[in-house]
From Swiss-Prot:
Pfam families: Abhydrolase_1. GO terms for biological process: lipid metabolic process. Keywords: Hydrolase, Serine esterase. It is an enzyme of class 3 (hydrolase). It comes from the Bacteria. It comes from Escherichia coli (strain K12). GO terms for molecular function: monoacylglycerol lipase activity; poly(3-hydroxybutyrate) depolymerase activity; short-chain carboxylesterase activity. One of its GO terms (cellular component) is plasma membrane. Belongs to the AB hydrolase superfamily. AB hydrolase 4 family. The keyword Hydrolase applies. This is Putative esterase YheT.
Length: 340
């Protein structure tokens, strides 16, 4: 059975425990605050375009030139829906890795680096092929070094699926999954209720803008036209018309059920830390796995507060991005022990 950890605001503070910023424990404030405190990328990224076997590409944002850092431990970040290096959690963690002497990299999903991808496909919560190919390319190109993968939200569900599918064959030493929607169908309904509809509208606008850019650059590469795209009102409708159809699923519900990581979690073989907040406004209790469903190598941490990929502690004058210490601290055992 997995190790289950809960944190409470009254407990003694350490990097393993999350205490929300005083007066700002509200889930929506926690979700939104990172964009206030982590507005700009504070390092100069080294960009690289990786051509894929099918003629498409993904863009990589490194903390430094990887050819000059082959010996360093590696931390790979998989972002969330319409995320990128500019997402506060992504560049914040890469910067934290850089400060520890590690090589950090964000693998942008297809079409998420600012330039539309070429092929008749996009990315989704269960699309593990690109991540798998990248991790193996990383090892082939730069040799063996301790490697960890971190997935946030959609990228977390994808990473969980990848870990489950490939088991010990996946070339990573450990993984961390944050705020992942392990039950996609339930989360899609939750996003249509109450204040969560604000997040749905925001994300849907990003999805539609990205799809419109793709249609303009590569006409005919999506199964709908611009007029149909403009009429989409819900993420589930977007997934029905585009995500499911372009990737061979019957509809959005079929896609959600086939790509939800929850039924696969018991197959994870690599050491993995999963972090959820009870008050995550993007999802409900159905994403919380049962302890008996998790293998011993999975540690599950459920916090009372934190919102969705928030977890802001400290004070307004001195905010603390808890994930930027919690994740590297947990991974140190796997990355630095083998790099000596």
């Amino acid at each position: 059975m997995a190790q289950i950890t809960t944190t409470d605001a009254n407990e003694f503070s350490s990097s393993a425990e999350f205490i929300p910023m005083r007066g700002f424990s509200n889930c929506h404030l926690q979700t939104m605050l990172p964009r206030l405190f982590r507005r700009q990328v504070k390092f100069t990224p080294y960009w690289q375009r990786l051509e894929l076997p099918d003629g498409d590409f993904v863009d990589l944002a490194w903390s430094e030139n990887p050819a000059q850092a082959q010996h360093k431990p590696r931390l790979v970040v998989f972002h969330g829906l319409e995320g990128s290096l500019n997402s506060p959690y992504a560049h914040g963690l890469v910067e934290a890795a850089q400060k520890r002497g590690w090589l950090g990299v964000v693998m942008h999903f297809r079409g998420c680096s600012g330039e539309p991808n070429r092929m008749h496909r996009i990315y989704h919560s269960g699309e593990t092929e690109d991540a798998s190919w990248f991790l193996r390319w990383l090892q082939r190109e730069f040799g063996h070094a301790p490697t960890a993968a971190v997935g946030y939200s959609l990228g977390g569900n994808m990473l969980a699926c990848l870990l489950a599918k490939e088991g010990n064959d996946l070339p990573v030493d450990a993984a961390v999954i944050v705020s992942a929607p392990f039950m996609l169908e339930a989360c899609s309904y939750h996003m249509e209720k109450g204040f969560s509809r604000v997040y749905q509208r925001y994300l849907l606008n990003l999805l539609k803008a990205n799809a419109a850019r793709k249609l303009a650059a590569y006409p005919g590469t999506l199964p709908i036209n611009l007029a149909q795209l403009k009429s989409v009102r819900r993420i589930r409708e977007f997934d029905d018309l585009i995500t499911a159809r372009i990737h061979g699923y019957a509809d959005a519900i079929d896609y959600y059920r086939q790509c939800s990581a929850m039924p696969m979690l018991n197959r994870i073989a690599k050491p993995t830390l999963i972090i959820h907040a009870k008050d995550d406004p993007f999802m409900d209790h159905q994403v919380i796995p049962k302890p008996e469903s998790l293998p011993p190598q999975v540690e599950y941490q459920l916090t009372e507060h934190g919102g969705h990929v928030g977890f802001i502690g400290g004070t307004l004058l001195h905010p603390q991005m808890w994930l930027e210490s919690r994740i590297p601290d947990w991974l140190t055992t796997y990355l630095e022990a083998k790099s000596c």
